[in-house]
A protein has these predicted regions:
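Extended, non-core accessory segments
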Residues: 1-78
Length: 78
């Protein structure tokens, strides 16, 4: 499944062929990226979710401002 990483501040767009490739690029475990995308909530919203624990926020900080989308979510977003 194709994954798009988009940084709304810089408007930089990165394309990955799969979740594992995306995870490796950002220094995360593939299961982390899979869990975020399967959550059904844009990853950027997870950062502001008060119920998220400190570890999750630290993991998400590795995205450096990028938000992750599946290709379907991306097409709906743009």
């Amino acid at each position: 499944m194709a994954i798009i990483a988009y940084n709304p501040t810089t408007e930089e767009e990165l394309h990955f062929s799969c979740k594992a490739q995306c995870a490796k690029y950002f220094g995360l475990k593939a299961n982390t990226v899979i869990r975020w995308l399967d959550n059904g909530m844009p990853v950027i919203e997870l950062l502001t979710d008060p119920d998220r624990n400190k570890v999750e926020i630290e993991k998400q900080s590795k995205l450096n401002g990028f938000e992750l989308f599946t290709i379907k979510e991306w097409l709906d977003y743009v």
